[in-house]
Amino acid sequence: MDKYNLPELFAKGELSDCQLVLDDGKEKISLNIHKCILYTASPYFKGMFGNFSEQKSNKVTITVHNSLVSSNIIKSFYGITTPKQNNWKYKLDKHICKNFFGLKTRLTNNIKVPKTNFNEFLDTIELIGYNEKTLKMIINNVPKDYNFDQLPLDLLQSMVGIYDKYDILIIKDSTFSVWSLNTKRYTHNFKFNGKISDFESVKNNKLFMIANTSDNLDVSDCSDSSDDSDNSDSDNSDSESLEKPKKFFPSKDDQCICVFDVKKYTVKKYFFYKNNKKILPKDIVCYIPEYNQVIVGNSGYIDLFDLDSKNFIRNLGVYETAYATHVDNDILYIVDDFGLHLIQFSTNKKLHKFEIISHRVNFDTKNIVIGEKFKITIWSKETRHVVSEWEMSAKIKSTLIIPGLNYIIVATSQRIYIYDLNTLLRIKKHDISSHHLVDLQEFKEKFIIIVCDCGFRIFDLDSGLVIDEFDIESISYINIIEGQYYDTIKKIKHSISKKLTA
């Protein structure tokens, strides 16, 4: 007797004991099937042909989500393979149909939905149900110009916590690496050929730094057009009309300002000139995004340059050992060995000087937190006086202001102390003696980054627990940056806010 294989048995329809009609409301597909094969392959058909009236029927019609997909699934019971489908609709419909037949199914991650099909995609996802995987699919495929206001509030709220909106920029041994908190891996690496001597915090997706590099990077020759006047570096000079050098040939190694674009992962070099001479950035760089200007420390002089026009604007004063600068409401704050200096930014008028002996200074919109060796001082920007100060029992390692929580964080090698920014009362403290703290960085919400001598930790300020840790030695710089989903999550939160206040 000839032995039938199952694909041939199905194709010829021999010994078929039932005609199965699949109806999705748009298309009907009729199959000559064998009840025993469907019975053994699918819990759905096992129930149908084992316990219900259909077990004696020679024709059965069932309503399915997609007739074609259901037909291909049933054919697979006979060992019949169909061409692989990459269409997003087919993949999702297959998941729905397999689930209907009681079969094991797993949603694939590589769903790519055309912009024109996004609303249809949302309807399909609603049939599947909202869970972490389907919500990720929505976020991954949402059009850039999509109006989230048309989605229900509960769906928007469930989408917010699915992806972390931040990544972490890590610089180690002149290698720039971006660590994704979503994939738990490095997504970008950039080798910088040179030595970096100073960093500024990331602003407007740009990291400004002073570097000595021979890289053939994108070079912006920031020449000005001034003369060689002897008094051009006086405190009250407004602007200098410098003439661009006729020729400039970069030396093999150039001390310059480098700007790393954390979105495009590119580095651009800037050479600045004053009095027809190229300056050598030394110990300070401060980017002012609202004006697209940069403050540069230059052999004791603090100079201001415009990045749009590439011109020298004016000298801001002489501060041989400046450690930090900050601009807020037309006030320039400069920290040097002699104290905290306040200067009217638009006029260079000196306003105030406050004597401090610390370089550890944090700026808030209202206050300045100064961490000396064993003392914390809170200085008011409005009154320009000390509003509070207190002694610490151990040497201060780091200080941090978290405006969103109204927190002042003070860290010693053993503990983290949390103070209320308004009342200045201590809220709580946490033991961190096992982490070998080097510095603190703001992260998000109630979390901070503890930089250690062997990596960094993500620390929960409420519980005092480490929720994630990364062993990376010799970190030169670490900062949070906008991640892949930053803009999308920002739009979702905006829509939630509108719905809650409507």
UniProtKB/Swiss-Prot annotation:
Residues 224-240 have a biased composition (Acidic residues). Residues 16-86 form the BTB domain. Residues 219-246 are annotated as: Disordered. Pfam families: BTB. PROSITE patterns: BTB. InterPro entries: BTB/POZ_dom, SKP1/BTB/POZ_sf, WD40/YVTN_repeat-like_dom_sf, WD40_repeat_dom_sf. Belongs to the mimivirus BTB/WD family. This is Putative BTB/POZ domain-containing protein L89. It comes from Acanthamoeba polyphaga mimivirus (APMV).
